[in-house]
UniProtKB/Swiss-Prot annotation:
A molecular function GO annotation: RNA binding
NCBIfam families (UniProt xref): PRK00132.1 (NF001099)
Organism: Salinispora arenicola (strain CNS-205)
Origin superkingdom: Bacteria
Organism lineage string: Bacteria, Bacillati, Actinomycetota, Actinomycetes, Micromonosporales
Name listed for the protein in its UniProt record: Small ribosomal subunit protein uS9
Similarity comment text for this entry: Belongs to the universal ribosomal protein uS9 family.
SUPFAM superfamilies for this protein: Ribosomal protein S5 domain 2-like (SSF54211)
Length: 154
């Protein structure tokens, strides 16, 4: 059995190993997806003035709760890009809390796609962690996932 050891890398292989140079953001939108509970959010960020649009409505109209608005804006505020990008979001499924969490994750992922240097700050703040908690399924013989019917001794 003979062993062949390559001492030189072929030119085409060297090109394949070279890091891929990213094109500057320019005017192209960045698209990402965020999920939480049953909610799925598709986000496009484009250079702009800081407007956030959810299903064609302003953020304040779609999420009247100040808590949800703050949650959604946190990644933009952390990276100091709240006035730099416009966010266009398509939200489907779930409730308001799930949609707000999914939107926050999608915005954080989009910010990393536009500026990879922001990753440590977003990671430290916990904006890149996908919350894996979902509704527990109902079991037969029980009224809900864990709630048992009332017990009668006699």
């Amino acid at each position: 059995m003979t062993d062949i050891i390559a001492t030189e890398v072929a030119p085409e292989a060297a090109e394949a190993l070279a890091p891929v140079a990213r094109a500057p953001l320019g005017d192209r939108p960045i698209q990402t997806v965020g999920r939480r509970k049953e909610a799925i959010v598709r986000v496009r960020i484009v250079p702009g003035s800081g407007r956030i649009t959810c299903n064609g409505r302003e953020l304040e109209a779609y999420f009247p709760s100040k808590v949800h608005q703050q949650l959604i804006k946190d990644p933009l505020v952390t990276t100091e890009k709240a006035e730099t990008f416009d966010v266009i979001a398509n939200l489907r499924g779930g409730g308001t809390t799930g949609q707000a969490g999914a939107l926050r994750l999608a915005i954080a992922r989009a910010l990393i796609a536009s500026e990879p240097d922001d990753r440590p700050a977003l990671k430290k703040a916990g904006f890149l962690t996908r919350d894996a908690r979902v509704k527990e399924s109902k079991k037969y013989g029980l009224k809900k996932a864990r709630k048992a019917p009332q017990y009668s001794k006699r």
